[in-house]
């Protein structure tokens, strides 16, 4: 079965169309003010009106106030929530939507414990640990740190590009891959050719 691909950090309608036309399975929209890919509610709602059928929409949050998450959900019809901070399982589950939990992986991260702690998650998104930055860094972690029989679905992220995603898929065999900076021309601005090549390389592996 072909790996699924999420293009994260969508800020422009042209980038949304480029991702969907290239075969993206999911699109990520960032609701974190410190990110250069952050969206207002109005901007996000306008973008989601352009999403075609059968493409999943994912909202990314970092230690957000629950009331803020609820306000986003009232304005923006997201399919899946992605929590990228220090949220506890109860924080993630309280909104009544499917969710995934990002884990910033370093050498001493116990991923089996993370999988047990977040057993109710639809999957674990594994990203590189960079001090003070919750994600979107373009940094890669050592894939050998991923246990071979992790009970959760693995969404591999962190430092993926069109040049290394095929190798990543062959070595890790993740449920999905997630990319943001690896397909950008500048922060928040995607490169349509990079998107197309990334998806082609990921799904051919």
From Swiss-Prot:
Transmembrane segments: none annotated. It catalyses: N-(5-phospho-beta-D-ribosyl)anthranilate = 1-(2-carboxyphenylamino)-1-deoxy-D-ribulose 5-phosphate. InterPro entries: Aldolase_TIM, PRAI_dom, RibuloseP-bd_barrel, TrpF_fam. GO terms for molecular function: phosphoribosylanthranilate isomerase activity. The keyword Cell membrane does not apply. Keywords: Amino-acid biosynthesis, Aromatic amino acid biosynthesis, Isomerase, Tryptophan biosynthesis. GO terms for biological process: L-tryptophan biosynthetic process. Pathway: Amino-acid biosynthesis; L-tryptophan biosynthesis; L-tryptophan from chorismate: step 3/5. CDD domains: PRAI. The keyword Amino-acid biosynthesis applies. Belongs to the TrpF family. HAMAP family: PRAI. NCBIfam families: PRK01222.1-4, PRK01222.1-6. This is N-(5'-phosphoribosyl)anthranilate isomerase. It comes from Thiobacillus denitrificans (strain ATCC 25259 / T1). The lineage of its organism: Bacteria, Pseudomonadati, Pseudomonadota, Betaproteobacteria, Nitrosomonadales. The gene is trpF.
């Amino acid at each position: 079965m072909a790996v699924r691909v999420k293009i994260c950090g969508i800020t422009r309608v042209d980038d949304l169309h480029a991702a969907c036309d290239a075969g993206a399975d999911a699109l990520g929209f960032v609701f974190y003010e410190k990110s250069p890919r952050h969206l207002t509610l109005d901007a996000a709602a306008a973008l989601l009106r352009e999403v075609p059928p059968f493409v999943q929409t994912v909202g990314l949050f970092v230690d957000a106030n629950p009331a803020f998450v609820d306000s986003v959900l009232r304005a923006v019809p997201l399919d899946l929530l992605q929590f990228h901070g220090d949220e506890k399982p109860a924080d993630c589950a309280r909104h009544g939507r499917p969710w995934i939990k990002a884990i910033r992986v370093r050498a001493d991260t116990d991923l089996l414990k993370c999988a047990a702690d977040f057993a109710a998650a639809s999957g674990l998104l594994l990203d590189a640990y960079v001090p003070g930055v919750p994600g979107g860094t373009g940094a890669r972690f050592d894939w050998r740190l991923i246990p071979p029989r992790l009970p959760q679905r693995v969404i591999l992220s962190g430092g993926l590009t069109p040049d290394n995603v095929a190798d990543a898929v062959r070595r890790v065999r993740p449920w999905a891959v997630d990319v943001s900076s690896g397909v950008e021309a500048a922060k928040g601005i995607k490169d349509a050719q990079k998107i197309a090549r990334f998806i082609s390389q990921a799904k051919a592996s």
